[in-house]
């Protein structure tokens, strides 16, 4: 089998020096480099020489596509396999081929395999696609689609790059389908058309919208003003607002179950409940004895009270009644403490207007006023120390003297 020019040159260089065998070049699985060298059968036996650098392609020719680093014109070169075995420029950078990428750097292009670092299977070598450099002001949408044509990429005859014209059209300039007249009409028909409503339905929708806006306005007004300050809607004042009640009585958590009064602490609440007990007991006692309930006292002392205190009329009898009771019990015994049952209507003295000292008597099982007596039969309660002193009978004959002595004492008691 005859060999090509590339292999013959290599064979002549190694003539009479190396015996070529199949195992010397394992990269080739037969074919051009896989035969026994018969022309050098008389060569002396030599040591086994290092395997020669393998060609990138089996045919031994230059790669089909490669770049020339001498200039920066981004021109791809196609090696011709015809008669003269020389490469010609076929595709220029300004041609209208679509690119595989938009990388303007040609140094990153796939380089041929080097000896010792080559492809383990040199028979299958990927062939790169031609590419060119894009202009910066050229958008991708304006580029037409590329229809590949194998006959124009690898011609079997040399063609000059300046006069290169493909046999078949390479590009198909198709307009944007969205700009087509038929497409525009279809899109306009598919758009949402306005709905035509009747007059009655339009009036109903407007009425509903007005009511909704009115409710929204009322809600905003009610939220802006506190509860109870807006009188536009009287029905809202009759509604029990728990939040408002809690805010008013948040600092008074305790409430009386009988009258509804509220208190801040437990001590005040306990005193109030004791008052209810005494009040109920006094009412029962009055009902049992057939007495009329006592009326509330006036703010000021009456004229009869002033005259009674000035003359010392019946007050002497009341005081002497208490004194006689003490004398009957015996002189050796200590005098009994004067006290009267507590009355919620008379908490202060009728003369000095000072509060009475209240305590609970276990003997009488009731709340009592300490050091207090009845001033008159009407039930006026005064302090013992505020009672006027009894006068002798001769003093009653001199009213002027009595007035001069007793009136200042009454005025002094009231001033206290």
Swiss-Prot record:
UniProt main location, coarse: nucleus
Coiled coil ranges: 199-220
Single Gene Ontology BP annotation: termination of RNA polymerase II transcription
Entries under InterPro entries matching the protein: PCF11-like, PCFS4-like, Znf_C2H2_type
Subcellular location: Nucleus
PROSITE patterns, sorted: ZINC_FINGER_C2H2_1 (PS00028)
UniProt-annotated stretches for the region Disordered: 1-80
Biased composition (Polar residues): 1-17
Keyword Protease: no
Bias type Low complexity, positions: 70-80
GO molecular function, one term: RNA polymerase II complex binding
Pfam families tied to this protein: zf_PCFS4
Signal peptide range in chain numbering: none
ZnF locations on chain (C2H2-type): 254-276
tRNA processing found in the keyword field: no
Alphabetized UniProt keyword annotations: Coiled coil, Metal-binding, Nucleus, Zinc, Zinc-finger
One GO term describing the cellular component: nucleus
Domain of life from the UniProt record: Eukaryota
Assembly and interaction partners: Forms a complex with cleavage and polyadenylation specificity factor (CPSF) subunits CLPS3, CLPS5, CPSF30, PCFS4, PCFS5, CSTF77 and FIPS3.
Protein name: Polyadenylation and cleavage factor homolog 1
Organism: Arabidopsis thaliana
